[in-house]
Structure formats: structure tokens, C-alpha cells
Amino acid sequence: MKVFHGIDRLPAFRHPAATVGSFDGVHGGHSELLAAVRRFARERDGESIVVTFSPHPRIVLETQTDLRLLTTLDEKVWLLERAGIDNLVVIPFTREFSRTGSADFIRRDLIGKLGVETLVMGYNHHFGHNKEGDYGSLRSSERPTLRLYRIEPFSVGGEKVSSTVVRSLVEHAEMARAARMLGHPYLLMADVARGSLRIDDPYKQLPPAGEYSVTADGVPVRLFIPSEGAPHLDRPFTKEKSIIEFTAL
């Protein structure tokens, strides 16, 4: 997967099919979107694109003081690449960018700069200044060059999957339910020095203090999350960018 930071100097993508969003957690609902994007790209022998934002818009707009995120940008890149996406475009989210109207975002950025031909949206996705744009507003506008598709809600056990629901599960140490909603184990990407984890993103969602069964790059270990101080493993190994996955018991 190719990763691009910014939208002003992009290559010409081949018949691109895209989706846009924060994709926090890259959960089961997101997987439905990603599968559709890949499918529509293949129909035209094109490329799949995910457009996301960094930092998370809520951080910049300060709309939620206690915000915690399921995935850091590095974790998101790892999960999207594993999902088979061809290209990830990371738009730097600023207060100035937040004032971009929905029509400008579609016309200037998605169509003008990325050349998007097919756009796949979640059922509740909003975009543009004050979240003024959505699937309905796009359907009613005249965009003859843009194919538009909407993905309906995705549920597990009768419950709609969302990043908010998964955050609550992780917060309450319900790691097995979180994994079912995500479609993969909850994970941390961290630098490990003599067993101690360094997590640079202060917004990363961690489960509460306790002892957890995890794998570190596929090796079963125990993870200890203290009330204070850094999380640490029961083995004193050192590795940059280690993938710590919670075992769903």
C-alpha cells in the first residue's frame, strides 16, 4: 500500500474508487466499506483509495475533551494495508481545512485532485464544514462523473458496530466482544524496550489496569497495565514497532 501525506502533489490514480473517513479501529463496518471499494476498483481495473485525516478532527476542533482513539495513525496504516487497500491519502486536518464546504471537498479535492470516479460512503457519514454533506446531498447534486454507493449498517449479534461501541468495550476490558466487533484482535503498536512499552500517542485507548493475555509479534506473552507508569510485558525483549494483540478469551 502506498501512503501519501497531503493532497496537493498526488500521482494520477487509475480509475480510482475511494472512501473517506476517520476509520478509527478499522472495525467490521469499515471492513464492509473497504471490501466494496476494492470490488468497485476491480470492476474498472482501477485502484482503491482510503482518504483519512490526521490528527483526528475531534482533536483539532476540541469537541471532546476526553477523546480516546482505538488506532494510532501507524496502526491504521498497518490494518488498512492488511485489508488490501492500494493507496492511503492522509489529509492534514487543520481548523482552516475544517471550514471547507462539502461541495468544495468533493469537487476540488476528491474529483479534482484525486480523480475519484467511484465514492463509497457509510450510511451515517457526514463531511464538509459543520458536517453539511452526506449521501443524500450528494445524490441530489449533479455529479455525472461520480458513481456513488452507500453501505448499510453492519451488526454483530444484533448490535450496530461503531467506533464508539468498541471504545466502550475496551474501556471496560471486554476484549473478546471488542474483537468480534472489530473483526480482528484489539492491538497496540509500540516500541518495546526490555519489556516496557512506549506508546507515543496520548489519545490511544487502553483497557483498564490489569493483566492481559496478548501476543507480541505472534508470541504469546502477558501484558501488565499498571494504574500508573508504562505498560510492560512479562519478557524483557526489545523491538521497535512491535504489534501487541489482545487474545480474545
What would you call each of these model-derived segments?
Residues 9-72:
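N-terminal catalytic cores of NTP/NDP-binding nucleotidyl/phosphoryl-transfer enzymes
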Residues 27, 80, 119, 178, ...:
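Residue-level signal for inorganic ion chemistry
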Residues 99-197:
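Classical nucleotidyltransferase
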Residues 193-249:
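Phosphate/ribose-recognition catalytic cores of enzymes acting on nucleotide-derived substrates
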Residues 72-89:
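A glycine-rich helix N-cap at a beta->alpha junction
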Residues 68-76, 100-106:
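Glycine-rich, highly charged phosphate/nucleotide-binding loops
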Residues 2-8:
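Short acidic-hydrophobic, aromatic-tinged amphipathic segments that line or gate anion-handling sites
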